[in-house]
Regions:
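Short, basic, glycine/proline-bearing loop/turn elements
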Residues: 16-17, 83-90, 118-122
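Non-catalytic C-terminal accessory region of glycerolipid acyltransferases
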Residues: 2-4, 8, 99-216
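Short acidic-hydrophobic, aromatic-tinged amphipathic segments that line or gate anion-handling sites
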Residues: 29-30, 87-90, 171
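Short gly/ser/thr-rich secondary-structure transition/capping motifs
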Residues: 22-30
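Generic preference for hydrophobic
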Residues: 29, 43, 66, 86, ...
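N-terminal nucleotide/polyanion-binding subdomain common to many enzyme families
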Residues: 11-21
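Catalytic core of membrane glycerolipid acyltransferases/transacylases, capturing the structured
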Residues: 9, 22, 36-93
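A conditional alpha-helix N-cap/helix-loop micro-motif detector
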Residues: 25, 92-95, 127
C-alpha cells in the first residue's frame, strides 16, 4: 500500500521560498479563502510555467502534494521536489505508483495538486485539452475540486502575473466526465476574469479573443 508523500519539507521550506517568490514576482492572488483548510481536495490549475504551483501555495497554509513529471526528479533540483512531497509521474505510460501515492494523499484527507493539461500549454488555444486523471482521482475519493487560473508574465515585479482561485465544488454524484467538464469550464471562466481585469500577456489576450469568436 502506497504511503502518503511526506510534507515536513514543504512546511519547512514553503514560508521562506514563497516569501522570496512573492517579493520577486509581486503576483496578484484572488480567492485566498477558497481552498478548504481540511479534507480531501484536488487543486487544479492551467499550466504555463514551472512555478505555477507556487501561486496556489500562496493561497493556503496547508501543504499541497503536487504531481510532477519524472524528468524533474533527475535534474539538479530533484532534492527539492522530493523534499517538498511532490509525486513523481512517468508520463510515458500508466504510472500505478504515482496513482497509488495520489490516492494515499486524498484518502488521508490531504491536498493534491494537479495540472489537468498534463504539460505546459504551448498551443495557440486558451488552455490545452484536459486529461481525466485529476477528475478520476477526485471522484474516486469524493474529494472537492478547486479550479485555479494563472495568467500573466513571470518577470521581476510583474504587473500582470495573477492567480485566481475559484470556489471548490463537490464531486460526489458526478461522473469523471462531468467533473472534468465542469473543471474545464470553471478554469476558463477564471482565466477570462483575470484578463478582464488586465492580468495577462498579449498572447493570452489574443487567444481569449480567438476562443470567444469560436464559442460565440
Amino acid at each position: 500500500m502506497a504511503k502518503k508523500p511526506r510534507t515536513w519539507g514543504y512546511r519547512l521550506l514553503a514560508p521562506v521560498l514563497l516569501l522570496i517568490f512573492r517579493l520577486y514576482y509581486s503576483p496578484k492572488v484572488f480567492g485566498k479563502g477558497n481552498i478548504p483548510s481540511k479534507g480531501a481536495v484536488v487543486v487544479c490549475s492551467n499550466h504555463k510555467h514551472v512555478l505555477d504551483q507556487c501561486l496556489a501555495a500562496l493561497a493556503t497554509h496547508r501543504p499541497i502534494n503536487y504531481m510532477a513529471k519524472s524528468e524533474y526528479f533527475k535534474e539538479s533540483f530533484a532534492w527539492f521536489f522530493k523534499l517538498t512531497g511532490c509525486i513523481c509521474v512517468n508520463r510515458n505510460g500508466h504510472d500505478e505508483d504515482a496513482k497509488a501515492s495520489a490516492n494515499a494523499v486524498l484518502s488521508s484527507g490531504g491536498a493534491l495538486g494537479i495540472f489537468p493539461e498534463g504539460t505546459r500549454n504551448k498551443t495557440d488555444n486558451l488552455i490545452g485539452e484536459f486529461k481525466y486523471g485529476a477528475a478520476s482521482l477526485a471522484c474516486k475519493n469524493e474529494a472537492m475540486m478547486v479550479p485555479v487560473a494563472v495568467t500573466g508574465e513571470y518577470k521581476f515585479r510583474s504587473k500582470t502575473l495573477c492567480s485566481r482561485i475559484g470556489k471548490p465544488f463537490s464531486t460526489k454524484g458526478l461522473t469523471v466526465e462531468e467533473a472534468n467538464d465542469r473543471l474545464h469550464t470553471e478554469i476558463i471562466k477564471l482565466i477570462n476574469e483575470n484578463l478582464a481585469e488586465g492580468f495577462g500577456t498579449p498572447e493570452e489576450f489574443e487567444r481569449a479573443s480567438r476562443y470567444s469568436k469560436i464559442t460565440g
